[in-house]
Structure formats: C-alpha cells, structure tokens
Amino acid sequence: MSTPLDHIRNFSIVAHIDHGKSTLADRLIQSTGGLELRDMKEQVLDSMDIERERGITIKAQTVRLKYRANNGEDYILNLIDTPGHVDFAYEVSRSLAACEGSLLVVDASQGVEAQTLANVYQAIDNNHEIVVVLNKVDLPAAEPERIREQVEEVIGIDASGAVLISAKTGLGIPDVLEAIVHQLPPPREGDATAPLKAMLVDSWYDAYLGVIVLVRIIDGVLKKGQTIRMMGTGAKYLVERTGVFTPARINVDELGPGEFGFFTGSIKEVADTRVGDTITEDKRPTAQALPGFKPAQPVVFCGLFPVDAADFEDLRAAVGKLRLNDASFSYEMETSAALGFGYRCGFLGLLHLEIIQERLEREFNLDLIATAPSVVYRLLLNDGSVKELHNPADMPDVVKISAIEEPWIRATILTPDDYLGGILKLCQDRRGIQADLSYVGKRAMLTYDLPLNEVVFDFYDRLKSISKGYASFDYHLTDYREGDLVKMSILVNEEPVDALSMLVHRTAAEKRGRQMCEKLKELIPHHLFKIPIQAAIGGKVIARETISALRKDVTAKCYGGDVSRKRKLLDKQKEGKKRMRQFGKVDIPQEAFIQALKMGD
C-alpha cells in the first residue's frame, strides 16, 4: 500500500562540519521510534568506523521515519543525511536533487561557515523550501538572536521562525518534526499508474546481496519481480527485493511515487549503477529520462605504492573492492623505478585521498607510500592537440609543448578578523587573486581565485594553523588558465628519481628545489662515496646539496714517515672512491620518500 503523496516529506539536513547534523538525525530517529534505545549509538547513520572516528559523514545515508503529527495524521518522513565536507560535494548535490526541502542547521555559537553557504546555495538552486534550525542553544556561548540575523544577512532567507534546539539533549526536537510536516512541501509530482520512473541516488556493495541501489521513485511503482532498465547504460536487471531503511533494512512489497527505498537485483558492480541515472520498467519505459548528474571528476591524483613490493597483489584486490563502493575513486596501474609497481589514483580532493589511503591501510592491512599529490594539467601541444597530464613524470619533451594550463578554483574563506592579515599573505604567496572581501558580523568573508596545485599540498593545514583553527574554507573548480609551469626533477647521484618529480610554477621552483634537496640530504644515509643531490629544470640545475663520503683513515699505519708515502695512499683512496662513485648505487630508504613528500612551508 503506497502512502498518499501529501503525507510524504523528503528532506535533507544541510550544515557545515561539526554543526551537529548527524546528532540531529539521531534524535529524529529516536523520537519517531526508528530504533530501539538499546540499538541507539551516536551517529547511527555514520556506518564506517572512519566516519565515526573523525566525526565526519562521508557517504550520504537515508532513513524512513513514521511520525504522527499533532493534528493526528500519520506522515512518512524520508531523511537524507549528507556529508558537509567540500570533497564530498557531489554526494550532497545528489541527495539534494532527490528532495523537496532542507533543514539548515547552524551552530548557535559559531554561526554561518563557508560550507554552510556552499551547501545552502545548492539547496536553493534545487528550489528547496528551507527550515532554519539553530543547534547547540544550550551552550553558554550560544547567541541565537545574533546568528538568526546573520543567517538573514548572509544567506538572505527568512530566519524569523528558526527552530531553536539542542540535538545533544533533545531540546526542541518535537518542534523540528512539526516544522518538517507543516513548512516543507510534499513531493511535487507522482502518478502511481504512469510508467516507472525512478532516480538512482546512491549504490553500494553488500557481500551477500550484491549491489544495493538506493532510489527515489518519481512515477509508477517498483516491486519485486519487475525487469527494470537503466536508461543511461541500457543494462537490464530483475528486481529481487525492495525495501526501506528505518535505519535497519526492512523489506517491503513495493515502493510508490515520492518514496525512498532500495532494491537489489544481482548487480555485480557499483560502477554499473551510475548515480543520477533514470530507472524504468523494461516492458513499459517512461518517455523522458531525468536530467542526469555529471559524474564526479577526479581533481587530485597521486601514486599509491606498497612499502613491500610483495603486497602488490593485495593492493590490487583492495583498490578493486574500494572502487565497488566509491565510484568517484579511479585508478590505473603505474610503475616507478624507485617504488616498483603501484597505482595512479584519482580523488575528489585531499580529504578523499586521505580517507581512501586510511581505509586501504586499515581495512586491508596494507602499508602504503603516497607520492606527491598533483592535479590534472592540460598540455597544448605544437601540433594543435590537447593532452591531459596526471603524472608529472609522464611529461613530454618541452619543445613539443606550446602552453600548459592548470585548474583554478574559487575559494571562500570565513575567518575571525584578527587572522585576516596572515590569511591574505598566505593566499598572496600561493599566487591567489582576491575577488572580494566583505564582513559578516566580526568575521571577514574572503573570496579568492587560486591555482589548485598551490592548494593541494598543505594550504588547508596552513590556513588552520594561521587562524588557530577558526577559519573555514570551501572551494569549487572554475576553469583552466595558462601558467608558467615547469617540471622540476630531483637527481640523486646524477640519476633522476621519477617519484619525486613535480610541476611547479617557475617563480617557486628554486625555493621548492632547495627545500627538497635539504630534506633529502638529512634523510639519505652516508655512503662510501660523495653523493650530489640536485634539483633541475630541464638541463639546468637550480639547487644542490652534497652528502659527504664516509672514509677510512688510510694513513693511520704510517708512523710519522715520509709525506710522499701518505700522498700515495691518499691518492689511491681517491681513485677508488671515484671508481666507486661511477658504479656505486645509492639506496634511498622508503622513509626518505615518505618524509620528502611531506613538504612543509
């Protein structure tokens, strides 16, 4: 039996990291009886260990809640919990496209942050009704009135009816439920008799059921036994079970218009289910597909290599399994003279990279080395063709290239006034171009255009340390612009080390090269011969350090004696060292790679 449309509410919770949206989701589940108290744990919807530990949401999750409103009517509330971090913005955009309304959660002590803005504008673009919720009003530092004004001033939406809550203590939760029912709209359309039309919101892999596909039904009915077709890929599947999450997985007979639920159907790989695809019945297809999403494009690339070459097979299996669940993560095989076999992987951003690396190390027990992260450059070649470059080591000969373009981002930074000077200097040092500076209460809102390759290294860490952790940062890619970029190679004993080569801006090349050489000098152990470490652009060396040789005192056995005798022994030693240097191999310890790639400023 499908629920009537006007008794369904589909909504998501939009907030900056740590403003308490997963805790609010917990309270909503608890107060509508979605889980028994004994099953309650904090952040019920953050199912990965790493999500709970870092206190962040990575995968969007959904829950169906039954709620009896004060007017005595029963409603079905479908809550979609979304990530707040900029790297997972595409998870947010998918979730928002599947809903009609949003709860905007703002911390009553901290106010509007950079990602609050980014996510709220996405919700407004999707024509969402927005209910403002001020959380953490029980904190001594909470200033609900000031924050209410701030929301109206910065975002431009009416916050006079904002709901004041404390998700931790449960204060004000009934008011939130009433606001969802009375202020958010029901699904806009939906005809149970029309051909099936459903939107694929997410999918993940289950060891027993194969791929579980999360869908939002627009028209028609999805039930067991139907043969469905994915309109994007043309693939057909037989539906084996349909169900909903409450958050426990519960099978139901059918899913009707406006509802959220899941189905399984012997789908082997998550890559077969494209997010944003339209699902329809094979026998009676819908005439018009839904406007799809752009697939998530990897922004940052880096090489992942096992510390022990024998673990390569395990790494191969592990990246394959992770790809099952994370369609935005891409990889291809790569070999490096210094590090052996590994994979060149693409990520949505640095947090995504860190999380994938941590999941590989944790869930699959691997020890990994990550090479320096790089972005996707566009090379305009002399013959008029355009080539994308993911790995600086693969750069063609300079004479073939007419120009190099690099990706630029538009960054929004919110910071307390006291730290503004330091942050402006940081952005300036990173070749930033200031686009705007305005004030939100006592905080400055900066808009900067920055090259992504300057942000990838350690911009976020520097920003946090300059602002003592108070600044927040959000960005989106804007375009590609031509830059004066050069490939810097690192040579150890006159042999280039491919894993350490990088593309840098010509003005920063010397500083970067010097830092790298100094760092390697500390990290590579002394050998019996002298080792030069050089940073070079093409054939021109721009920085050099030398590791001195270990030497034996060959003149120790001459008691006083004749100077020509000593000379002879020293010259003989010198000759040997020279020959040794010609044929000697320098062993660079793995530790040195790991440390050298952690560049500081």
Swiss-Prot record:
Subcellular location(s) of the protein: Cell inner membrane
Keywords: Cell inner membrane, Cell membrane, GTP-binding, Hydrolase, Membrane, Nucleotide-binding, Protein biosynthesis
UniProt entry tagged with the keyword GTP-binding: yes
A biological-process GO annotation: positive regulation of translation
Residue ranges annotated for the tr-type G domain, each copy included: 6-188
Family classification: Belongs to the TRAFAC class translation factor GTPase superfamily. Classic translation factor GTPase family. LepA subfamily.
Protein name: Elongation factor 4
